[in-house]
Amino acid sequence: MRLNDDLSARTVVHAGAMSWVPSPAKGVERRMLFRIGEEKARATSIVRYAPGSRFARHEHPGGEEFLVLEGTFQDETGDFPTGTYVRNPPWTGHAPGSASGCTIFVKLGQFGEADRTRIAQPPEGGTAMPRQPGVTSSRTLFDGANERVVIEEWRSDIELDNPDGLELLVLDGCFVEGGDMLERWSWLRLPAGEPLYAQVGSKGARVWIK
């Protein structure tokens, strides 16, 4: 399977309006945003676990990162409530599930081979950054050699340079970018060199950005 795999093209997916697609694990469904491959794939998805559902133990050769959007995600290493951000390096494994149900935003197979640091940022964790025009809050969750991950709250129009490529997920609120209204769980990817111009609504927006 190849889905939204042209990294040179601007891509928008309104994931909040998509249907859920069953996964091989009973009670686990997903909304696919980007994918190259079948079950062992390089992928970006929103995944929903029904109460009591889980995957069998497996490894992620290319690493895994996820943000808990709703509920509490669980594996052998602990419980991860809403707002937790986790990076599991290449070749780490687990048996993920949720006793009470949860929804996560997850990226698979997109680590560099040298990225071997496991991170588990709690809700509201990370490093607070200085405020910028239009940005009322900015927290860096990860800052590595090739990428930086932040959560920001926007209260007015935003302009961001984008020399290296950018993707974001709207966590709350809304804004208009490139003529598209991006609302909760909308996903945007911009190629390197294409700046972001966001017209932010009166309620503001909270976004996850890489």
Label the model's feature ranges.
Residues 28, 79, 90-115, 181, ...:
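Ligand-binding loop in jelly-roll beta-barrel domains
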Residues 53-56, 74, 86-95, 188, ...:
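Histidine-centered metal-chelating micro-motifs
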Residues 28-32, 36-74:
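The feature marks the first
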Residues 53, 57, 131-162, 166-168:
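Catalytic core of non-heme Fe(II) oxygenases with the double-stranded beta-helix
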Residues 1-39, 101, 105-150:
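A short, N-terminal "cap"/entry segment at the start of jelly-roll beta-barrel domains
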Residues 50-51, 60-75, 156-158, 162-178, ...:
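Glycine- and acidic-residue-biased ligand/ion/polar-headgroup-sensing regions
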Residues 45-46, 56-60, 77-78, 96-97, ...:
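Short histidine-centered beta-strand/loop micro-motifs
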